[in-house]
Design a protein with these regions (language model features):
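Extracellular/periplasmic bilobal clamshell ligand-binding domains
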Residues: 314-347
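Bacterial signal peptide processing site
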Residues: 25-27
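A bilobed periplasmic-binding-protein/Venus flytrap-type ligand-binding module shared by bacterial periplasmic
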Residues: 158-165, 200-202, 268-283, 299-303
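Extracytoplasmic ligand-binding site segments that recognize negatively charged/polar headgroups
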Residues: 53-67, 79-97, 101-237
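C-terminal motif of bacterial Sec signal peptides marking the signal peptidase cleavage site
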Residues: 20-23
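A ligand-binding cleft/hinge motif common to bilobed small-molecule-binding domains
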Residues: 113-117, 234, 238-258
């Protein structure tokens, strides 16, 4: 009888555990146990699990590229993703952890307060173990918080305009205060978004102490997300905004838009973590590792800051985007600011 390979043994072990769980009336997620051996054993167990699910607030086009790249690298593992806002996704993660009925395996968030709190507590996560985290180009010491949350990407926001309506464009944030743009500007509603609250406060700290109040006087259109602002800019529903990511993708598609990063420009990092409630714990580790590889970063970085150097399509380095001051973004402080904002923008 030929000797069994280590990979065959791992696959057999995972299958046996699954069979025992089913026989005992257990649910499918409980059948998958994390492997603590060599990385090849983790990958083999991940292939036996066969799928992995990502929750993310990243751009849907980049997530689709990530799915293609990941499945090219790991054809035996299907990547599924749910794209939503932090307001929608973070409570799901908390509920899945509390109930022990996980759907997501990896969670990618841009909410700095949630990230800081969860990284400190370690409640929702397990440590990523993939070999790519040791890559000097990634720089684990400045890219991982609390040994669990790892820097994956960053959004950098700037000025955007419709070139048909504004052929001369915008040179500085002050150009948005031109009375001719009254009612034609788009902004993001900060309701529930600590990061967006930080963005408005950044405007007043760095551009003009009264910039937000002056912007409100322009009677801008309000959108639930930066993606909605970009779509409105592309269609001509609005003609300018101070709250859009680099419109690299839109320009490549022929949209009549342009953009500029002012000095300074506001940004917010994306951190990811392997969920303790992951129904596919080994596939979760494989996806986490892939996210910080060159292939993973290339898929995620069109119009964003990358966590590795020299990534095609990236507009900056994610490690250069400061983490927001979460002490100024407590739930009470965010609620108070949102009330102030509503008084200015929705009166």
């Amino acid at each position: 009888m030929p000797a069994l390979s280590r990979r065959t043994l791992v696959l057999g072990f995972v299958a046996a555990v699954a069979a025992m769980s089913t026989a005992c009336g257990g649910s499918a997620p409980s059948a998958n146990l994390p492997v603590s051996g060599e990385w090849a054993e983790v990958v083999a167990a991940a292939e036996a699990e066969g799928s992995v699910h990502l929750y993310s607030t990243q751009h849907p086009d980049n997530l689709a590229k990530l799915k293609t790249a990941f499945e090219r690298k790991y054809p035996r593992i299907t990547l599924e993703f749910t794209r939503g806002t932090d307001v929608e996704i973070n409570p799901r993660v908390e509920t899945e952890h509390r109930t022990g009925r996980g759907t997501a395996d990896v969670h990618m968030t841009s909410d700095p307060v949630w990230t800081a709190t969860a990284a400190e507590s370690g409640t929702y996560s397990v440590e990523p173990v993939g070999p790519s985290f040791a890559d000097p180009a990634y720089g684990r010491e400045r890219s991982v918080r609390g040994d669990r949350f790892f820097l994956t990407s960053a959004a950098v926001f700037g000025l955007g305009w419709n070139t048909t309506a504004l052929p001369r464009g915008l040179a500085t944030p002050a150009d948005l205060l031109d009375p001719a743009l009254r009612g034609r500007i788009g902004v993001t509603n900060p309701s529930g978004f600590a990061a967006v609250v930080d963005q408005y406060q950044f405007f007043d700290r760095n551009w003009d102490p009264d910039f937000t109040e002056k912007l409100a006087a322009q009677q801008p259109r309000i959108y639930p997300s930066a993606l909605g602002v970009a779509q409105a800019l592309n269609s001509g529903e609005i003609v300018a905004t101070p709250m859009v990511q680099p419109l690299v993708r839109e320009q490549a598609a022929g949209a009549p838009v342009d953009w500029k990063l002012p000095g300074p420009a506001w940004g917010t990092p994306w951190y990811s973590h392997v969920l303790a409630s992951a129904p596919h714990p080994n596939a979760a580790q494989v996806l986490a590792d892939f996210l910080v590889t060159r292939d993973g970063q290339t898929a995620l970085s069109t119009g964003y800051a990358a966590a590795l150097p020299d990534i095609e399509g990236a507009v900056a380095r994610a490690q250069d985007v400061p983490f927001p001051d979460t002490a100024a973004l407590t739930p009470d402080a965010v609620t108070r600011y949102q009330q102030t904002w509503q008084g200015m923008f929705q009166r």
